[in-house]
């Protein structure tokens, strides 16, 4: 049987590194279909840190796409597992027959599913991408994204799968012992990316709570984002006093980020698509409830796991937040499907499906 090849078709260092390390540490030892990768971006020590994997790096999207298409045409039994899919050339290859549906398996990352960009080239490309998506052999996604995808592509097979968030299961019960009182701290957004709609989120938080809460805005990623960070800072200072606004413009190491999250009382995410599942997982693990946009389909995954969900359209106050914290504290977090190690079973099944080992 031909070994499955995994494709990271866009240079997204943080997510690509997470996926590679997860496969190296959790999957490669038990499956030959978890070892071959084609990745856009620089090695930057990844090969050394992932010795169980065979990783081929490409300088750009186009060069990777050309290599994938050549492999697909040379051997129609060759299957590919696309993790996120931000590579237009690959979509066009699927649409034109360069890559066959039986060769194309796609793990939706959220941002690559929704049509939120307003630029002309995106508006021209989106209809073609929708046509190509009808030809995918199988999609893997959160419950909410599967539901969203099925509305336009009901005939495409869908399987539940969660991004492998880096988590320490031993911390699942730690939050239950913490006493929460005094001024609330609210985390706004999961990164410095504009898709977090930071300014709109800050205004929404201020409308709900006024200048009575401390707001923390992590903006250390992506790099070279100084102009937008300053824009958010000025908008924040027009709403909150200086001591109540903390904008982080340095990228935090994992343990420092975890410590930051555990100081919060609430996470506030205004974006209308599924994203930031890693931050949501870490907040929930710490017993911190999250406010979501009702258009963000991840609320379906949360309610399926019996987790409290607050919405941006709700009338929020401290009593409601504390009640959500109490409800979250009563949940057995060891049973949550999108937590580590529970998501591992979904990945093992996904590999078997994509490799053609199970129907």
Swiss-Prot record:
Coiled coil: none annotated. Its main location: membrane. One of its GO terms (molecular function) is 4-acetamido-4,6-dideoxy-D-galactose transferase activity. InterPro entries: WecF. It is a peripheral membrane protein. Pathway: Bacterial outer membrane biogenesis; enterobacterial common antigen biosynthesis. It catalyses: beta-D-ManNAcA-(1->4)-alpha-D-GlcNAc-di-trans,octa-cis-undecaprenyl diphosphate + dTDP-4-acetamido-4,6-dideoxy-alpha-D-galactose = alpha-D-FucNAc4-(1->4)-beta-D-ManNAcA-(1->4)-D-GlcNAc-undecaprenyl diphosphate + dTDP + H(+). Keywords: Cell inner membrane, Cell membrane, Glycosyltransferase, Membrane, Transferase. Disulfide bonds: none annotated. It comes from the Bacteria. It is found in: Cell inner membrane. Its EC number is 2.4.1.325. GO terms for cellular component: plasma membrane. The keyword Membrane applies. GO terms for biological process: enterobacterial common antigen biosynthetic process; fucosylation. It is an enzyme of class 2 (transferase). Catalyzes the synthesis of Und-PP-GlcNAc-ManNAcA-Fuc4NAc (Lipid III), the third lipid-linked intermediate involved in ECA synthesis. Belongs to the glycosyltransferase 56 family. NCBIfam families: PRK02797.1-1 (NF002752), PRK02797.1-2 (NF002753), PRK02797.1-3 (NF002754). This is TDP-N-acetylfucosamine:lipid II N-acetylfucosaminyltransferase. The lineage of its organism: Bacteria, Pseudomonadati, Pseudomonadota, Gammaproteobacteria, Enterobacterales.
């Amino acid at each position: 049987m031909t070994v499955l090849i995994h494709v990271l078709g866009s240079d997204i260092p943080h997510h690509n590194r997470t996926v590679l390390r997860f496969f190296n540490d959790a999957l490669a030892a038990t499956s030959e279909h978890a070892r071959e990768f084609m990745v856009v971006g620089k090695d930057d020590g990844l090969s050394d840190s992932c010795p169980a994997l065979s990783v081929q790096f490409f300088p750009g999207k186009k060069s990777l796409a050309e290599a994938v298409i050549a492999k697909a045409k040379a051997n129609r039994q060759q299957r590919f597992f696309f993790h996120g899919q931000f590579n237009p050339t690959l979509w066009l290859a699927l649409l034109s027959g360069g890559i066959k549906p039986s060769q194309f398996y796609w793990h939706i990352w959220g941002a690559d599913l929704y049509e939120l960009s307003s630029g002309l080239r995106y508006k021209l490309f989106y209809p073609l991408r929708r046509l190509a998506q009808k030809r995918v052999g199988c999609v893997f996604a959160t419950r909410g994204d599967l539901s969203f995808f099925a509305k336009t592509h009901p005939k495409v097979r869908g399987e539940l799968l969660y991004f492998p968030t880096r988590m320490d299961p031993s911390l699942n019960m730690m939050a239950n012992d913490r006493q929460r009182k005094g001024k609330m701290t609210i985390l706004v957004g999961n990164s410095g990316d504009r898709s977090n709609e930071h300014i709109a989120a800050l205004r929404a938080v201020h409308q709900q709570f006024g200048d009575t809460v401390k707001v923390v805005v992590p903006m250390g990623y992506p790099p070279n984002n100084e102009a937008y960070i300053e824009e958010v800072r000025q908008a924040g200072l027009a709403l909150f006093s200086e001591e109540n606004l903390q904008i982080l413009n340095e990228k935090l190491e994992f343990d420092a980020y975890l410590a930051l999250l555990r100081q919060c009382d609430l996470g506030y995410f205004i974006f209308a698509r599924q994203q930031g599942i890693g931050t949501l997982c870490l907040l929930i693990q710490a017993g911190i409830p999250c406010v979501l946009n009702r258009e963000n389909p991840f609320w379906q995954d949360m309610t399926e796991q019996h987790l409290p969900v607050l919405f941006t359209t709700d009338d929020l106050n401290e009593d409601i937040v504390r009640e959500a914290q109490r409800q979250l504290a009563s949940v057995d977090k060891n049973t949550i499907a999108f937590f580590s190690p529970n998501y591992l079973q979904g990945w093992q099944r996904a590999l078997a499906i994509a490799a053609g080992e199970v129907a």
